Amino acid sequence: WVTDITYIATDEGWLYLAGIKDLFNGELVGYALDTRMTQQLVMQALFRAVAAKRPGKGLLHHSDRGSQYCSQAYQKLLRQFGMQVSMSRKGNCWDNAPMESCWGSLKTELVHHRRFASREQAKREITEYIEIFYNRIRKQARLGHLSPAAFSQHYYAMQMAA
């Protein structure tokens, strides 16, 4: 998994979005939105990802070196979930390119075409983008031009047939 935080402008001020992407199928497996960029924000995204996917021990979790990800509480949580910690080299955004690409898609396809009057409006539209469009409909070249949901369905059908 890779993770990062981005921010979205609203008429009420910034809204922060922490997301976790599964590199296997390109799905955003967990995310959280809040008015502040805190360790609680990234922990909420992690709890949601773990609750949704129940990963096995040893899953590789990659982030940048932001204070939220380096916090003792977050690192402890990763250990409790049995995850292997990987962090970007200092000042090297290329290490987390898949997550940066995800944020670029979100902003190009949704955020830059909207003016959010409120944080609640932004939360609703971002949630719909992730849950309906990004994970279920949006095709990714890396996945053979399938959506994350279709790729997973195809993969597991092939596993059952083998």
Feature locations, PLM:
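Charged DNA-binding/catalytic regions of mobile-element recombinases
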Residues: 1-162
